[in-house]
């Protein structure tokens, strides 16, 4: 392990590769491992328990070397974080194709994965860790903001003002929660076992305060709720201890969820009664005992969530598979509360809406502020988008290369991409822009306990859709395309695909952008048409998507 090595993406217009498409892949790989961005960069872990950018430092170095020598008509193949081949393809083909953590269905278990990982044959890519498009906590912030906003609309008249949200986990994903709640005018108590993670969110202004005392956290929360003021509190502790204690005291939060790394009971979730350091020792000394204790804690954690739901709280699973883990340990009504996608997000997916993100390769925040203005001018009628961008400018701390995210739908993404390409071509932006997204998107994931939970036609587990998404984006000329397994919810529970396309100001980039930013969100609309959603069919007809079964 190379404890002292620091990786940071180059900035500016000087190329170290043979073209901007390759340079973009190189910089985004390096950006994933920037200490400002990654959770444990010395171990190549970006976020999500054990989501890595490369399999080993040797593999990382080989990827960097390959990208620097890659021609404009060649494609690099990466298998679970290791570069395995370079083939001559053509200029409009992707420069990199990535497959991470994919296992044949019968062997798709954490136990088999860990065995392969120990042998150095595989790595866990999460969603955007192994596909080189993680942008830090902002990457999930707008989705988290939209989720809490929709909960507020459905249950609390449109705002969380004077309301308490209880959640846990301040890692790369969960770290967005406190700011998302305060952006919705609410009060958040976020339980986190790792003090360093709480400190990081304080440093980045995602979190307002920290305490070790539940009494103090509740006192602060009550005071802010009474005044109708937003406040976020990081509470040092274990959710498996704190949640049941809150139930015991008869305190009923308005909203309850969780974003601990419960999807991974070995490398993610920390059992009750252990410090981070003690957990690390037990994990190494007796992994089976560690998993047993983690799962017992998860059962207590979920039982408390069920108790709060019965007492009147709005409770939802925030996509970490915690219900499944508890169910497998014998908690039979673990699925009594819904996942966040069917509860709040699916109507957006029917329009091909999802987390469109972009990164300024110049390293200059001003390039992002210029693109913010361009987006507001492109969609002047979208007031919630304007509100989001204005809030993001004030409150979001850039991690690594400056980046932005906003949810855009079919027809909108292509307009944005072409506008960015024009801005690069004219010199308004100092360097090219990288455009990507989370794998959590409308048409790029099969995950029956998360994105495709409770599909109208029962097609929750059909994994053809993310594969078609990757294939069509490859055909359309994305700069790099990835197919992953297990992201978000753990090995055995999801299949998903990612794409990145670069706006470098050229005519070639314009063609790529026009195709990819149409096919990619188009798959989201099509997937939901096929599942029987009327809204998706209406969108497809209005916007001219060809559907052979409807022609």
Swiss-Prot record:
Binding-site positions, NAD(+): 48-49, 126, 172-174, 192, 197, 238-239, 259-263, 269-270, 318, 488
HAMAP family, A to Z: HutU
Note on how the cofactor is bound: Binds 1 NAD(+) per subunit.
Recorded metabolic or biological pathway in which this protein acts: Amino-acid degradation; L-histidine degradation into L-glutamate; N-formimidoyl-L-glutamate from L-histidine: step 2/3
Matching NCBIfam families: hutU, PRK05414.1
Known cofactor(s): NAD(+)
Alphabetically ordered keywords of this record: Cytoplasm, Histidine metabolism, Lyase, NAD
Compartments, as annotated in UniProt: Cytoplasm
Protein name: Urocanate hydratase
Active site per the UniProt annotation: 406
E.C. number(s) listed in UniProt: 4.2.1.49
UniProt catalytic activity: 4-imidazolone-5-propanoate = trans-urocanate + H2O
Record's keyword annotation contains Lyase: yes
Alphabetical GO biological process terms: L-histidine catabolic process to glutamate and formamide; L-histidine catabolic process to glutamate and formate
GO cellular component: cytoplasm
GO molecular function per UniProt: urocanate hydratase activity
Keyword field contains Transmembrane helix: no
InterPro entries on file: Urocanase, Urocanase-like, Urocanase_C, Urocanase_central_sf, Urocanase_CS, Urocanase_N, Urocanase_Rossmann-like, Urocanase_sf
Described purpose of this protein according to its UniProt entry: Catalyzes the conversion of urocanate to 4-imidazolone-5-propionate.
Superkingdom field: Bacteria
Family: Belongs to the urocanase family.
């Amino acid at each position: 392990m190379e404890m002292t090595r620091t990786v940071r993406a180059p900035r500016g217009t000087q190329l170290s590769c043979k073209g901007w498409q390759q340079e973009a892949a190189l910089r985004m790989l390096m950006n994933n491992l920037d200490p400002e961005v990654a959770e444990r960069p010395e171990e190549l872990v970006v976020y999500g328990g054990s989501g890595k950018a490369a399999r080993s430092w040797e593999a990382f170095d080989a990827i960097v070397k390959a990208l620097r020598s890659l021609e404009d008509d060649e494609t690099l193949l990466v298998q679970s974080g290791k570069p395995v081949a370079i083939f001559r393809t053509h200029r409009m083909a992707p420069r990199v194709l990535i497959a991470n953590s994919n296992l044949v269905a019968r062997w798709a278990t954490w136990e088999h994965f860990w065995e392969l990982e120990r042998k150095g044959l595989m790595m866990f890519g999460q969603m955007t860790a192994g596909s080189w498009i993680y942008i830090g906590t902002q990457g999930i912030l707008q989705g988290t903001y939209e989720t809490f906003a929709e909960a507020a609309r459905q249950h609390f008249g449109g705002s969380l003002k004077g309301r308490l949200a209880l959640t846990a986990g301040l890692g790369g994903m969960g770290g967005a929660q406190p700011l998302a709640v305060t952006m919705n005018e609410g009060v958040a108590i976020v339980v986190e076992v790792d003090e360093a993670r709480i400190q990081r969110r304080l440093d980045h202004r995602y979190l307002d305060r920290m305490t070790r005392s539940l009494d103090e956290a509740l006192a602060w929360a009550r005071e802010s709720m009474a005044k109708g003021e937003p406040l976020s509190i990081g509470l040092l502790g274990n959710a498996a201890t704190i949640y049941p204690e809150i139930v015991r005291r008869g305190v009923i939060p308005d909203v309850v969820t969780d974003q601990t790394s419960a999807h991974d009971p070995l490398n993610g979730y920390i059992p009750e009664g252990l410090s981070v350091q003690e957990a690390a020792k037990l994990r190494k000394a007796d992994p089976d005992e560690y998993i047993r204790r983690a799962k017992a804690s998860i059962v207590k954690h979920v039982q408390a969530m069920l108790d709060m739901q019965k007492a009147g709280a709005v409770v939802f699973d925030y996509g970490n598979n915690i219900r499944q883990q508890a169910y497998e340990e014998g908690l039979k009504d673990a699925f009594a509360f819904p996942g966040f996608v069917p509860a709040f997000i699916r109507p957006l997916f029917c329009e091909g809406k999802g987390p469109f993100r972009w990164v300024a390769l110049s390293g200059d925040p001003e390039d992002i502020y210029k693109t913010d203005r361009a987006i507001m001018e492109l969609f002047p009628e979208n007031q919630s988008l304007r509100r989001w961008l204005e809030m993001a400018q004030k409150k979001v701390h850039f991690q690594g290369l400056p980046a932005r995210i906003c949810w855009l739908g079919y027809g909108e993404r292509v307009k944005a991409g072409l506008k960015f390409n024009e801005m690069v071509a004219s010199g308004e932006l100092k360097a090219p822009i990288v455009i990507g997204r989370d794998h959590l998107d409308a048409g790029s994931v099969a995950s029956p306990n998360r994105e495709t939970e409770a599909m109208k036609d029962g097609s929750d587990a059909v994994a053809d859709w993310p594969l078609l998404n990757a294939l069509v984006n490859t055909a359309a000329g994305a700069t790099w395309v990835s197919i992953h397994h297990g992201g978000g919810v753990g090995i055995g529970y999801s299949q998903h695909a990612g794409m990145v396309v670069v706006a470098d100001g050229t005519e070639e980039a314009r063609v790529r952008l026009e195709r990819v930013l149409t096919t990619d969100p188009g798959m989201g609309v099509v997937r939901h048409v096929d599942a029987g959603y009327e809204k998706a069919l209406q969108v497809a007809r209005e916007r001219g998507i060809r559907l052979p079964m409807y022609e």
